[in-house]
C-alpha cells in the first residue's frame, strides 16, 4: 500500500485527511474505503502475482491500484464503476500514475464483467443484499470473492470456490455504501 499515493485518489478538499484511517467522501454519495479496510479485503483475497482480478465499485481507483501492485506486472485488474464521472476520473488518475494493468469499465457491477471471466479474485466495494450470482459464476475454481452483505448491518463475506463447492466465511462487521443494480439494491 505504500506504493500507492492515497492522496491522489481523493478530491482536493479532503487531501489533508488522505492518510487518516477512515473512509473519505469522493463525490456522488460515494466514499473511498479506509486504508485498513482495503488491507483487510486484500488480505482475505490473497492476491498473487499474475492474478486476474475483478473489482466492483471503482470509485476513484485507489483499491484497484493497490490490487494492481499485488497482482504485479503479469496480473491485471478489471474494475467496474456505475457513475460516469467517477469512472472518468479514475481512468485519468490511474493513467497519470502509470497503472497500466488496471482497466476501468462503466456498467452495472452487479452483473460482473463476463467479457474477461473467469477471475482469480473478485473484490466488491459496496454492500449487496446477497452475493450476486453472476459474480460467483465469473469466479474461477479455485478462486476468492470478498463482498459486504446486508442493508443496515453488514458482514464482510469471503466466498471461496474450491473443487466445485462454494465455501462462505464471515470476516466481520463492516459499513459500506449500497451496491445498486440488477442484482443489488434497487432505488436506494
Swiss-Prot record:
GO CC entries: cytoplasm
Which EC main class describes this enzyme?
Answer: transferase
Which E.C. number(s) belong to this protein?
A: 2.1.1.77
Reported function: Catalyzes the methyl esterification of L-isoaspartyl residues in peptides and proteins that result from spontaneous decomposition of normal L-aspartyl and L-asparaginyl residues. It plays a role in the repair and/or degradation of damaged proteins.
Q: Which PANTHER family match?
A: PROTEIN-L-ISOASPARTATE O-METHYLTRANSFERASE, PROTEIN-L-ISOASPARTATE(D-ASPARTATE) O-METHYLTRANSFERASE
Q: Which organism is it from?
A: Methanocella arvoryzae (strain DSM 22066 / NBRC 105507 / MRE50)
Please name the taxonomic classification of the source. Answer: Archaea, Methanobacteriati, Methanobacteriota, Stenosarchaea group, Methanomicrobia
Catalytic activity reported: [protein]-L-isoaspartate + S-adenosyl-L-methionine = [protein]-L-isoaspartate alpha-methyl ester + S-adenosyl-L-homocysteine
Protein name (record)? Protein-L-isoaspartate O-methyltransferase
Q: Give this protein's Gene Ontology molecular function annotations.
A: protein-L-isoaspartate (D-aspartate) O-methyltransferase activity
Q: Highest taxon of the source?
A: Archaea
The active site is formed by: 33
Tell me its family.
Belongs to the methyltransferase superfamily. L-isoaspartyl/D-aspartyl protein methyltransferase family.
Cite the SUPFAM superfamilies for this sequence.
S-adenosyl-L-methionine-dependent methyltransferases
Q: Keywords in UniProt for this one? A: Cytoplasm, Methyltransferase, S-adenosyl-L-methionine, Transferase
Cell compartments where the protein resides: Cytoplasm
What Gene3D superfamilies does the annotation carry? Vaccinia Virus protein VP39
